């Protein structure tokens, strides 16, 4: 995909994309392209590139839809930054108080995702006009259906009740009559599935350009959508899970079948998924990733700006780092393992994890930077309980996320300063570990507990061997790493809880946790317990409360509601 981003300026005149407007302003128009001149494979390809480019087209945190700023609502992460007023809209989200329909961040994500859909639909419309002699037509249409499904999926996870724009020939007048309640919850998921099935039936097993989705990517995406759909929310006046659908779970099993992923597998070390160097990009575990580049002739390269607020403020290195999205103490405690090498489940948060005494899952040290250990495994940047590692003087603790950050030694090469800090590290959307965990969850819910536990143990076996960066930690820093596999038999309820915990540990700080809690119907119970336990050590939660049947989803933005001419209905919860 990196190479297809370079031709983006070629389509400015076709779709109104303005990144190259200075170039256009320097020339006198010489005429208008006829319909037949526009309907060429070259122009269709350029429109497809424009749709992909939405993921790298802006120097700000929402540019690639990473979702970390909405995951601060979970028990995995604090907002971070320099106090509660720094990024106050994120603080409102993390305590679930004072969230307004006019918050800029809520509207901004809505607008960006529908802009993505607009570009995709423009590409689909033009592709449909090209002749059958365009050999890539069907494949490009499948790619666009995949991207449209992705945008609708993100919107539905965030706002629940959304207008689906699946008619690429929709007129402006028709668009203004769309309703966000045309489809009920299950029907909305099915709209996304329909696009994905078209993609799945056409996409190839491999792509020359790495950023384009493959058949396996469509399969992984279908599994995820069916898993969300399985947890039915049938009551229009509630966001509660009313039932778990067996048929949808069986679809998850179908689309996570190992035969669909012959080209994929687990990395030997989980950390390989979160390294920017070329030899680690698009590895065996990466099924579909947003591609970023450097040194491509543009000012900064097509960099990942979505993590721009996350790096800490290290003097002489990451100066100006904003220190957002900080791992919570609760998450750190969750990695604590017992004498049997297994998670502590109901008791992990009864005491603060002590690295000098307590056993821990090795993934802790690959997910969370902690005082007493080197930041990003670089001994030149030892972490301490100082302002370097907390702009808020400890209000949000001194932990730092490792999965989004890059070793400061790579500044100027893979880590670059613009308005924020950005890197060329790809953002993996679907990785093979997620596929295994989705399959395990479906098996557990269907009562096939042995198969579920076997899949969890695959993940844990890989975790035990993920020590290439931290092998010296026990002898050098005194940490105690111990993880073991599950043995014996477990009933359905036990297996489900095992899968949920494993998903939290494996996918920690990848912006999935809050959405998982909502999907399971666990959000109110888990988060209100979390708030109550955090108050004594984290004052930001003194007024925090999760209101069931409201806070599971964002409100429909005020500006969108106002412009809908009465066709949109606000989400439940008295916004």
Regions flagged by a language model, labelled:
Residues 1-29:
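Bacterial Sec-dependent N-terminal signal peptides
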Residues 20-69, 339-342, 351, 356-358, ...:
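Membrane-proximal, proline-rich intrinsically disordered regions
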Residues 40-49, 53-59, 83-159, 175-190, ...:
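Conserved, well-structured interaction surfaces
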Residues 113-116, 191, 274-337, 422, ...:
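Long, intrinsically disordered, low-complexity segments
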Residues 156-163, 207, 228-237, 447:
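Short coil/turn linking the two alpha-helices of tandem helical-hairpin repeats
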């Amino acid at each position: 995909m990196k190479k297809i981003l370079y031709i983006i300026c070629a389509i400015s005149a076709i779709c109104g994309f303005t990144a190259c407007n200075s170039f256009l302003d320097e020339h006198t128009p010489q005429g208008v392209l006829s319909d037949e001149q526009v309907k060429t494979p070259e122009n269709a390809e350029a429109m497809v590139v424009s749709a992909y480019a939405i993921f790298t087209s802006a120097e700000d945190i929402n540019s690639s839809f990473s979702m970390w700023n909405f995951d601060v609502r979970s028990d995995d992460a604090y907002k971070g930054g320099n106090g509660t007023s720094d990024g106050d809209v994120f603080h409102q989200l993390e305590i679930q108080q004072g969230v307004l329909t006019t918050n800029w961040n809520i509207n901004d994500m809505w607008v960006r995702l529908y802009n993505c859909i607009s570009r995709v639909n423009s590409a689909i419309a033009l592709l449909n006009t090209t002749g059958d002699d365009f050999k890539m037509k069907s494949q490009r249409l499948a790619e666009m259906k995949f991207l449209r499904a992705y945008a609708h999926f993100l919107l539905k996870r965030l706002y629940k009740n959304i207008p689906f724009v699946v008619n690429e020939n929709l007129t402006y007048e028709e668009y203004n009559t769309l309703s966000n309640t045309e489809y009920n919850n299950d029907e909305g998921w099915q709209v996304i599935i329909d696009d994905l099935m078209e993609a799945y039936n056409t996409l190839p097993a491999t792509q020359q350009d790495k950023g384009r989705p493959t058949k396996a990517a469509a399969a992984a995406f279908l599994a995820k959508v069916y898993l969300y759909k399985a947890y039915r929310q049938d009551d229009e006046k509630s966001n509660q899970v009313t039932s778990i659908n067996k048929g949808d779970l069986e679809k998850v099993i179908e689309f996570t079948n190992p035969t669909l992923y012959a080209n994929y597998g687990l990395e030997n070390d989980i950390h390989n998924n979160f390294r920017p160097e070329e030899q680690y990009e698009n590895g065996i575990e990466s099924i579909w990733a947003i591609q970023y580049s450097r040194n491509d002739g543009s000012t900064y390269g097509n960099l990942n700006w979505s993590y721009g607020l996350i790096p800490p403020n290290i003097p002489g290195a990451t100066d100006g780092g904003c220190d957002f999205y900080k791992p919570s103490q609760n998450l750190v405690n969750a990695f604590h393992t017992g004498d049997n090498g297994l998670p502590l489940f109901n008791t992990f948060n009864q005491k603060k994890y002590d690295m000098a005494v307590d056993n821990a899952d090795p993934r802790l040290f690959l997910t969370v930077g902690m005082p007493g250990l080197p930041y990003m495994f670089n001994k030149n940047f030892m972490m301490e309980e100082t302002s370097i590692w907390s702009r808020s003087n400890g209000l949000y603790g001194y932990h730092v996320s490792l999965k989004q950050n890059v070793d400061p030694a790579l500044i100027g090469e893979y880590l670059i300063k613009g308005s924020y800090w950005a890197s060329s590290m790809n953002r993996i959307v679907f990785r093979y570990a997620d596929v295994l965990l989705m399959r395990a969850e479906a098996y557990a819910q269907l009562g096939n507990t042995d198969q579920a536990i076997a899949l969890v143990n695959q993940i844990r076996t890989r975790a035990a061997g993920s020590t290439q960066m931290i092998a010296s930690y026990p002898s050098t820093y005194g940490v105690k790493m111990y993880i073991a596999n599950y043995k014996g038999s477990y009933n359905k309820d036990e297996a489900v809880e095992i899968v949920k915990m494993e998903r939290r540990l494996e996918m920690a700080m990848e912006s999935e946790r809050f959405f998982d809690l909502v999907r399971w119907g666990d959000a109110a119970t888990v988060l209100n317990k979390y708030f109550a336990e955090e108050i004594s050590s984290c004052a930001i939660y003194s007024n925090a409360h999760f209101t069931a049947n409201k806070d599971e989803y964002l409100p429909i933005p005020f500006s969108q509601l106002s412009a809908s001419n009465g066709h949109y209905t606000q989400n439940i919860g008295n916004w």
